[in-house]
């Protein structure tokens, strides 16, 4: 899965927005003004994304899949870096994005969730 396909998938999520809030051109994807993913640029030859995952699953994902590592420049207890050029199938990468989105979306106030879904 390439970066452009990933970007399109991030933006297909309800209420998703793209920002570049840092001093470098890192695309950050948010829902309800909370980040659920970003596209890394630190390794130009190795495309990757950072995703938020549940604390009870984060270490399991890293131990089972060699292309999932602790989140680069992120809180390692909440974020994983997912490499796009390895053995992970496109559908599985989308599932990981869905998990991140759902985790962040569910943390939003109910009023904000309703606004996004309407």
Segments predicted by a language model, with ranges:
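Charge-dense, helix-prone N-terminal extensions
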Residues: 1-118
